[in-house]
Design a protein with these regions (language model features):
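Classical Sec-dependent N-terminal signal peptides that target proteins to the secretory pathway
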Residues: 1-24
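N-terminal helix-cap/turn-to-beta initiation motif at the start of protein domains
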Residues: 22-30, 124
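A short, structured loop/turn motif at beta-sheet edges
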Residues: 25, 100-101, 128-131
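Short, solvent-exposed loop/hinge segments that bridge or flank secondary-structure elements
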Residues: 28-62, 86-98
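Generic short beta-strand segments
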Residues: 32-38, 81, 106-111
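Short, surface-exposed loop motifs enriched in S/T, G, D/E and P with embedded aromatic residues
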Residues: 64-74, 80, 127
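Mid-chain, structured segments of secreted extracytoplasmic proteins
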Residues: 72-104
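Edge beta-strand at a domain terminus
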Residues: 111-131
């Protein structure tokens, strides 16, 4: 009886370990950059970005510099926010939104200078999930 209880306990511990490994997996996306210009959307030449969504750390790492964004896991989208600075003097505020179904992404960049937005830009990304 005791040996059966020990075996069941080991199975329980192993199943918990493997289930946490399955849910802590990162989602890595390879994205083509679409620029927004005066005439509409244009594909950038040979520009790609990598988006790494770490569900366990609640962080999205974006771009070649792997800038960490705070992750909000919404029902239909992953939303990442990055803010550095003080809006009264100088600050950078970025918002990254990734659609869970289509993996379409958009990045809104705001630069605050003397309590006003001095630069406001948008970028769009067509992403493919990496295996």
């Amino acid at each position: 009886m005791r040996q059966a209880a020990v075996i069941l306990f080991k199975i329980l511990i192993l199943s918990i370990f493997f289930s946490t490994q399955a849910f802590s997996k990162n989602i890595i996306l390879d994205c083509d950059v679409t620029l927004v210009g005066i005439e509409g959307k244009d594909m950038a030449s040979d520009d790609t970005e990598v988006i790494d969504i770490n569900l366990k750390a609640k962080t999205i790492f974006f771009g070649a510099e792997a800038i960490p964004y705070n992750l909000r896991n919404r029902i239909n989208v992953y939303e990442g926010r990055y803010f550095k600075g003080n809006k009264r003097t100088f600050a950078i505020e970025n918002k990254l939104v990734i659609d869970k179904k289509t993996l379409q992404s958009s990045l809104n960049k705001n630069v605050w200078d003397n309590k006003a937005i001095s630069v406001n830009s948008y970028s769009y990304f067509d992403c493919i999930k990496r295996n």
